[in-house]
Amino acid sequence: MIEINTFLLNGQKYTTSETITLLDLINYFGYNKSLLVIEYNEFICKNTEWDKIRIQKNDKIEIVTIVGGG
């Protein structure tokens, strides 16, 4: 039986039938890794943890990109 995981990313609901990590998610959406801050279930994640954190059912993820300017 295939397990379906539903999670929130920046307030939007997503569903996956595969086990994915935060890094997989970042790569899928094409984010620039050097300009990100990620909140995972209300905790800020270090970029060294992105490949270790597996997205689970009902997780809440916020990805914020840093934009410079003047």
Task: Show where each model-derived region lies.
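Ubiquitin-like/PB1-type beta-grasp interaction modules and other compact soluble beta-rich domains
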Residues: 1-69
